[in-house]
Amino acid sequence: GPNGSGKTTFFNVITGIYRADTGRVVFNGADVTNATGRAVYQAGMARTFQRSRLSLPLSIFDNIMIGNHKRLNQGLWFNLVKRGDFKRQFEESYAAARALVEVFEPGLADRLFEPVAGLPMIDRRRIEICRALISAPRLLLLDEPSAGMTHEETAELMNDIMLVRARNKDLTIIIVEHEMSVIERITERCVVLNFGRKIAEGPYRTVASDAQVQEAYLGVA
């Protein structure tokens, strides 16, 4: 949908950031309407945001691990008493983070402990997606992942996302996007919003030729 159509608001309602006034949010057979963000995360959803949420002084690895707290035992007692388990969890987490990064940019795999601050925008976006993927979600929500990037960087990132999808058959990816060229290339099914309402749904070619969609984007049918 065009700017201001309600795409990000839709994501925020799904993930518990905004409360729904009416209707229900059902995920994997469970009603998660107005659930907390943590509950939604535990249910198997993960997301990225339009604006970067990375902590720039932290390393690539540390930023990715922020998304892994569902799997990690935490607390001083655990770290002090069960040091063997802590070491095992760290090694498993490191291997998982490295494997994810290698899907996007193999060169970053040997730089996991470098600060994120020195990375270009495309690599920061990659790290954000890796942080979402580290929890092994069933639903990945990407909110305008190509925002702020060049056409070349956008094409490269879309290749990465398609590779992630190909390697994770049980993973569903929903992308918020308003650039039709990106939508045409990467999507299997499109849902178009305008002023908070769904105006079209289906394959890209069907949606792109819809009179309401053309009016929403161009002002004319």
Model-derived features: positions:
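Glycine-rich phosphate-binding loops of nucleotide-dependent enzymes
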Residues: 1-221
